[in-house]
């Protein structure tokens, strides 16, 4: 007979400024082992509403990588990961964020196979596909007409249209859910005019400066890197671009403040995304997730810090396969 004390829900430590938010956390097909441990920890100690969906995609013609090119995953590995998330009753959103896909790649068999298996392993009914290309959305619908499709913000970044409420309404005719352009997420004069705000999603931890002048250039470069991963000059160009513009300057970060989150929520937005695209290590993703979920009230700060530290210690080894500067802060077995 177990003598462990019962686990009590910690509703009072979870931030309550977005009580009905539908959270989506990145890291799928990249940080899966630690992401599943995080989800188990959250389901044990936190209210069920905390996280209902993970996002991500394996490296393929339809996805992008910020730091070099990840090694390809086998079909068997992808199948196993989809099955594991289904077993955990967690929805999966395939994040196909490449906005510049070659016409012949729209029929990529691996990508279409992923979408097919995603729809077949969908016990929660929450599985979706997120694309950054109208052409890719059309290609997917030809094979999977019932697949719910989200419009990725990268489609808006590379688009030439003027982003007005009427433009967003046209996107509503094509997509089930639309990610707001990062600039529009901090422009109340625009998002308060949206007729169906519940059909929009917002990234909370966008790393790029608010007025980043080279967002389009960066996405175009990353798309070229996907097509030619062996071209080292492209990687050098990407490194030069990010260092030149101060992409990671925290004082200019596009992270949404609590007041900005509350304003979007009050307007009717309910879908909030914690992305992993710009993280080299899963530890950073986990820390961001806890920061966004846990209360910042002073009377709970010690409990919140203890829970976050306990979770990171519980997860232990963070296997950052890319240079990150976090080697001194790894959790390992004694």
Could you tell me what each predicted segment is?
Residues 2-167, 174-334:
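Active-site pocket-lining/capping segments in soluble small-molecule metabolic enzymes
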């Amino acid at each position: 007979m177990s003598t462990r004390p019962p686990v009590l829900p910690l509703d009072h430590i979870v931030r309550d400024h977005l009580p009905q938010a539908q959270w989506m956390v990145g890291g799928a097909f990249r940080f899966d082992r630690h992401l599943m441990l995080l989800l188990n920890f959250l389901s044990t100690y936190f209210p069920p509403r905390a996280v209902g969906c993970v996002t991500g995609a394996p490296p393929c013609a339809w996805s992008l990588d910020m730091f070099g090119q990840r090694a390809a995953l086998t079909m068997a590995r992808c199948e196993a990961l989809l099955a594991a998330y289904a077993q955990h009753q967690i929805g999966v959103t395939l994040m196909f964020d490449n906005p510049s896909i070659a016409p012949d790649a729209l029929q990529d068999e691996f990508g279409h196979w992923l979408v097919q298996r995603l729809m077949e392993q969908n016990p929660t009914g929450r599985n979706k596909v997120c694309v950054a290309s109208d052409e890719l959305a059309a290609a997917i619908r030809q094979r999977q007409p019932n697949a719910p499709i989200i419009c990725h913000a990268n489609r808006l970044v590379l688009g030439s249209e003027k982003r007005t409420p009427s433009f967003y309404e046209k996107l509503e005719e094509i997509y089930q859910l639309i990610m707001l352009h990062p600039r529009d997420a901090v422009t109340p004069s625009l998002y308060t005019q949206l007729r169906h705000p519940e059909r929009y999603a917002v990234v909370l931890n966008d790393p790029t400066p608010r007025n980043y002048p080279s967002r389009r250039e960066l996405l175009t470069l990353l798309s070229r890197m996907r097509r030619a991963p062996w071209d080292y000059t492209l990687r050098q160009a990407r490194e030069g671009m990010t260092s030149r513009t101060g992409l990671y300057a925290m004082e200019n970060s596009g992270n949404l403040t609590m007041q900005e989150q509350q304003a979007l929520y009050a307007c009717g937005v309910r879908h909030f995304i914690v992305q992993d695209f710009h993280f080299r290590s899963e530890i950073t993703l986990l820390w961001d997730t806890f920061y966004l979920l846990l209360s910042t009230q002073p009377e709970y700060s010690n409990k919140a810090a203890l829970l976050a530290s306990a979770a990171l210690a519980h997860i232990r080894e963070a296997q950052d396969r890319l240079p990150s500067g976090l080697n001194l802060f790894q959790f390992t077995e004694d």
